[in-house]
A protein has these predicted regions:
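Alpha/beta-hydrolase fold nucleophile elbow
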Residues: 165-176
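Acidic catalytic loop of the alpha/beta-hydrolase fold
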Residues: 249-253, 280-281
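Catalytic histidine-centered segment of alpha/beta-hydrolase-like enzymes
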Residues: 277-287
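Short alpha-helix in the alpha/beta-hydrolase fold that links the catalytic acid
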Residues: 117, 240, 254-263
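An N-terminal hydrophobic leader/cap segment in hydrolases
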Residues: 36-78
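Membrane-embedded segments
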Residues: 82-159
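Short beta-strand/loop motif that positions the catalytic acidic residue
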Residues: 238, 244-246, 250
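Hydrolase active-site cap/lid region
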Residues: 181-240
Length: 302
């Protein structure tokens, strides 16, 4: 009788164990899917908070100057099989032999809000190709990411190279987060054969470092940052002359982070620290020092 009981009991126990294992695996899969969903949600929220892109054209904008060009190009979309629109401006200098600068802006403000700084760069002697990453201005309205911004900068650089065939007259410029984009771009190219110089204004070491500088809550957020822009880890690969400008009254990116980035770069990096300079208006906070630094760089390009 005992043997008969065990004969039926043992297979039942084994089946129960197999069922538990299957249930455990299913539970792990469901937990993993839930975690991935939470991570995806967190990543989306991070990107919305970090970039805060400004779409559209501001009220009251009357257009670019005569001779300046606003145009769009098509790029692979975020969703497979789709196409997105990438808006660029071509703002040539009166001197046809002027060096050409790729303008990479930071968070929040689109190109329309960057016009005063762009005008200051043209005043110094640059032709300017400026790009609104997808999510900003008249480019396709997406929630941008570090990857999409890098991709957009690559497309803009190809356009600049088409318009300016001489590498010795090509310059990369990045303001704030745009500096992180500029460092990424420059770190994958070579001085002389690809471009001539890199200009960074109000730029940071990395986004997690900016968050940490805001206090303990920012330090906690930095632990979960999906958007890095790790310029400090890349800038040593930049072999071209570098000009860095930063205001000592910058309330967005502390000047200490700019100094740390300078220290991670090549030893002959030129550092211009503007007394009382803010985050976004160095061109108007100290116009003489700003213009002098840019014109000296242009003179060195030959």
């Amino acid at each position: 009788m005992v043997r008969i009981v065990f004969k039926f009991l043992i297979p039942s126990v084994r089946a129960g164990r197999r069922g538990l294992r299957r249930a455990s695996k299913l539970g792990l899969i469901l937990a993993a899917l839930a975690a991935l969903s939470a991570c995806a949600w967190l990543d989306t929220k991070q990107r919305q908070l970090v970039y805060r892109p400004t779409p559209g054209v501001p009220a009251g904008f009357t257009g670019l100057r005569v001779g300046d060009l606003s145009f769009a190009t098509q790029v692979p979309g975020v969703e497979p099989g789709t196409r997105d629109s990438l808006q660029m401006w071509w703002l040539p200098h009166a001197n046809s032999r002027a060096p050409t600068l790729l303008y990479l802006h930071g968070t929040f403000r689109n190109l329309y809000r960057n016009l005063p700084k762009i005008d200051a760069l043209r005043e110094a002697g640059f032709s300017v190709l400026a790009v609104d990453y997808r999510g900003w201005g008249e480019s396709s309205p997406i929630i941008p990411s570090e990857a999409t911004i890098y991709a957009d900068a690559n497309v803009a650089w190809a356009e600049l190279a088409r318009r300016q065939p001489e590498p010795r007259l090509r310059v990369i410029f990045g303001h704030s987060l745009g500096g992180g984009v500029a460092v990424e771009l420059a770190s994958r190219m070579r001085h002389g054969s690809d471009y001539a110089a890199l200009i960074l204004e109000s730029t940071f070491t990395s986004l997690p470092d900016v968050a940490s500088a805001a206090g303990w809550l920012g330090s906690l957020g930095a632990l979960f940052a999906s958007q890095k822009f790790d310029s400090a880890g890349k800038i040593a690969k930049v072999d071209a002359p570098i000009l860095m400008l930063h205001g000592d009254a910058d309330q967005t990116v502390p000047v200490a982070l700019g100094r740390q980035l300078r220290d991670a770069a090549r030893k002959d990096t030129r550092w211009v620290e503007i007394s009382g300079g803010s985050h976004s208006r160095l061109h108007s906070d100290a116009p003489e020092a700003y213009q002098q630094a840019l014109k000296l760089l242009i003179a060195q390009l030959g």
